[in-house]
């Protein structure tokens, strides 16, 4: 293993500067942050060097500057580098802020990163101001007086601060410069945790894989970020029901990873809808099988670059144990850049923790939209032979998850666990009304494909039924 990844200190540096998660198709607009870091390093090094020879005394300042320019080795270069880098610092920081405002860097989950960046800007201006007001600096006496007196606007204590020696003490100790550096370090820590305002690629993608993928059809990374979280929650529910993440071994012992959503051919419109939003994956149709099917297959590169980063960005995850385990395994392989199948460990850490009890499922912000996706794969709306309306969800044993359905639909109906399957079903008038209210909620992702048609027909049959005719139905569209 390389020293960068084994040494305790170098491992930290490597994770921040070399292996930090960043998009593979990042633009030049994301260079301003690294350029500003270079400017900060230059300012600190040249500033400390100048401070060794500069005297802030009015009587000695001019002579100390001449000493730097004439006697210090390359002193003229250090002085001009310090002053010109200061100008470049502000020029780049305004471009950096403009890029952040244009791409929405102030939005969650990077709100705190943006707030710390604002603090850095204020400290940066304060530090620059202290440099300008030094004897033989670039600011006039009256200009410095006006800016200093801004502090007097602070209620109750402002005037005392201006008249006291506190500001002089701060200048002499270079306190603001020290605080500025500390805040910058904290800013980079937050940026490492919350990523930049673009989708980070998970792990390392080989250049050959990037060449093979058809990027011409893809959206811009910023457009992917704008995809509603309701759609991603719907997709997670659909995958939990009728999808799987397949990790297989190639003939040469390498790892192959893909995500597959398999539906009946009549539900082809669902896959076409997903493909139209994500612009990734390939739809395959199998008409020769006993039960004609269609499959959306998303390859490893698209999982690393698009889908998994989107789920991580929106804090959406799979809620069935099987799918969660598959996701954790794939994420571990991506993050650790594992190439060979025999290098996969027996146990992998969980990226997200599945709720331990039913109530915790209902507290997840994406759970309602997840139910819609799960309904499109494992749900059904039908009329029984006795003309009772029924809504049903069915899958293999996931006890806590199905108990959460009871809480979400506010019903006391018992979960049927026959033949190692969980079955949640309601048919009473009050329960059917709750189901109608749930799927009629305006903020919910709609049902899609054949399940939507089934739901509309189900509503029409309920309206015509004597038993359910008095229920409140959504307006017909």
UniProtKB/Swiss-Prot annotation:
| Signal peptide stretch | none
**Chain positions covered by the region annotation Cytochrome b:** 1-163
**Record's bilayer topology term:** Multi-pass membrane protein
The compartments listed are: Mitochondrion inner membrane
Query: Which segments carry the region annotation Maturase?
Result: 164-477
Q: Which Gene3D superfamilies match?
A: Cytochrome Bc1 Complex, Chain C, Homing endonucleases
Keyword annotations for this protein? Membrane, Mitochondrion, Mitochondrion inner membrane, mRNA processing, mRNA splicing, RNA-binding, Transmembrane, Transmembrane helix
Instruction: List the Gene Ontology MF annotations in alphabetical order.
Output: electron transfer activity; endonuclease activity; oxidoreductase activity; RNA binding
**Where are the bilayer-spanning segments?**
32-52, 86-106, 113-133, 142-162, 166-186
Q: Matching InterPro entries, A to Z?
A: Cyt_b/b6_N, Cytb/b6-like_sf, Cytochrome_b_N_euk/bac, Di-haem_cyt_TM, Homing_endonucl, LAGLIDADG_dom
Q: Listed GO cellular component terms?
A: membrane; mitochondrial inner membrane; respiratory chain complex III
Chief localization: mitochondrion
Query: What biological-process GO terms show up in the record?
Result: mitochondrial electron transport, ubiquinol to cytochrome c; mRNA processing; proton transmembrane transport; RNA splicing
* General function of this protein: Mitochondrial mRNA maturase required for splicing of intron 3 of the cytochrome b (cob) gene, containing its own coding sequence.
Q: Write out the similarity annotation.
A: In the N-terminal section; belongs to the cytochrome b family. In the C-terminal section; belongs to the LAGLIDADG endonuclease family.
Q: Please tell me what else the database record remarks about this protein.
A: Encoded from partially processed cob mRNA that terminates with the in-frame coding sequence of the third intron.
Name this polypeptide is given: Cytochrome b mRNA maturase bI3
Q: Which gene encodes it?
A: bI3
């Amino acid at each position: 293993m390389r020293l960068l990844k084994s040494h305790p200190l170098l491992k930290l540096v490597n994770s921040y500067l070399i292996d930090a998660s960043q998009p593979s198709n990042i633009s030049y607009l994301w260079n301003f942050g690294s350029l500003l870091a270079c400017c900060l390093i230059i300012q600190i090094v040249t500033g400390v060097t100048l401070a060794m020879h500069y005297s802030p005394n009015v009587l000695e300042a001019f002579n100390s500057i001449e000493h730097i320019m004439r006697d210090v080795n390359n002193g003229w270069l250090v002085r001009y580098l310090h002053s010109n880098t200061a100008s470049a610092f502000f020029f780049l920081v305004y471009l950096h802020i403009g890029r952040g405002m244009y791409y929405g860097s102030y939005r969650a989950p990077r709100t705190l990163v943006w707030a710390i960046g604002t603090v850095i800007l204020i400290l940066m201006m304060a530090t620059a101001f202290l440099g300008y007001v030094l004897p033989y600096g670039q600011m006039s006496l009256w200009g410095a007086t006006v800016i200093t007196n801004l502090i007097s606007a602070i209620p109750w204590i402002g005037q005392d601060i201006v008249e006291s020696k506190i500001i002089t003490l701060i200048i002499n100790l270079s306190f603001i410069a020290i605080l500025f550096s500390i805040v910058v370090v904290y800013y980079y820590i937050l940026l490492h945790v919350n990523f930049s305002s673009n989708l980070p690629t998970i792990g390392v993608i080989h250049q050959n894989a990037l060449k093979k993928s058809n990027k011409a059809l893809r959206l811009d990374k910023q457009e992917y970020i704008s995809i509603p979280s309701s759609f991603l929650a719907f997709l997670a529910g659909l995958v939990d029901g009728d999808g799987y993440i397949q990790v297989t071994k190639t003939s040469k012992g390498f790892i192959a990873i893909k995500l597959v959503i398999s539906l009946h051919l009549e539900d082809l419109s669902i896959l076409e809808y997903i493909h139209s939003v994500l612009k990734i994956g390939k739809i395959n149709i199998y008409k020769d099988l006993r039960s004609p099917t269609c499959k959306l297959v998303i390859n490893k590169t698209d999982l690393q670059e698009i889908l998994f980063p989107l789920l991580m960005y929106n804090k959406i995850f799979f809620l069935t144990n099987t799918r969660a385990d598959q996701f954790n395994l794939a994420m571990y392989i991506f993050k650790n850049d594992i190439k060979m199948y025999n290098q996969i460990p027996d146990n992998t850490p969980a990226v997200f923790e599945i709720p331990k009890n039913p109530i915790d499922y209902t507290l997840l912000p994406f759970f309602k939209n997840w139910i819609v996706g799960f309904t499109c794969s494992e749900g059904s709306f039908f009329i029984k032979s006795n003309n009772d309306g029924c809504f049903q969800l069915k899958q293999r044993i996931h006890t806590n998850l199905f108990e959460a359905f009871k809480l979400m639909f506010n019903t006391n109906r018992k979960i049927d666990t026959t033949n190692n399957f969980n079955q949640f079903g309601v048919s009473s008038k009050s329960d059917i009304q709750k189901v109608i209210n749930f799927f009629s909620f305006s903020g919910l992702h709609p049902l899609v494909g054949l399940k939507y048609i089934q739901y509309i027909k189900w509503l029409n049959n309920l309206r015509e039924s004597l038993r359910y005719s008095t229920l409140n139905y959504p307006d017909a569209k």
